Amino acid sequence: GTLLDDTWLCVEGINQALIKRKLAPISEAKYREVFTFPVRDYYMKLGFDFDKEPFEIAGDEFVAYYGENFHKTKLQNGSRSVLKAIQSNSISQSILSAARQDFLLDWVSAHKLDKYFLKIVGIDNQYAKGKIEQGIKLVNDLPYNEEDIIIIGDTVHDSDVAEKLKINCVLIDHGHVSGERLKKTGRKVFSNFKDLITHIL
């Protein structure tokens, strides 16, 4: 969501599962209003009944659809430029993601972004669990103090992760969560990378 424009694919994927269960499909705007972590809670908001079937069934359907269509995703506008700008200022960059590690490495490689990152850290499951734990490991592995690290994210969860890790955070509203919801975190929220990079550098 921050670097990769995949919100549309997440909406397509969840709608496949909703329609199969005779539940109402959602728009991208609705998605950005309800998407949350843990993702099980987001599914329940949309009407999935986990007394009837385990969460993992719908979750696996979504992951399968996402995986089959993942190659269609593109980078957010300005992603490459912002990575270049940060790198040219001798600031190191790493990825911390709630995406499965193999998906994460695939898309970073597919978009030829490897050279920009010191570390690329995803999770070991397909249900978006464990970002905080992986974040703790990442921060401990980085040769920097907490006050020298900043998270750039697109979800309320990114703000929560930053709070747990005791590091700074700014948010961008072109991803999985609406600007209105992001502003409620109290973080600085930007609508494009140009304004964000001016704030950081």
Locate the predicted segments by residue:
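N-terminal helical cap/lid subdomain that shapes the substrate entry/recognition surface
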Residues: 3-80
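Acidic, Mg2+-coordinating phosphoryl-transfer loop and its flanking beta/alpha structural elements
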Residues: 150-190
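Conserved phosphate-coupling serine/threonine residues in phosphotransfer and NTP-handling enzymes
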Residues: 2, 97-99
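A short, structured active-site edge motif that brings together acidic residues
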Residues: 30, 114-129
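Short, acidic loop-to-helix structural element flanking the phosphoryl-transfer center
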Residues: 67-95, 102-105, 132
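Conserved H-loop
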Residues: 24, 49, 114-118, 145, ...
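Structural recognition of alpha->loop->beta junctions
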Residues: 111-121, 181-201
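Conserved Lys-Pro-Asp/Glu-containing loop-to-beta segment of HAD-superfamily phosphomonoesterases
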Residues: 131-160
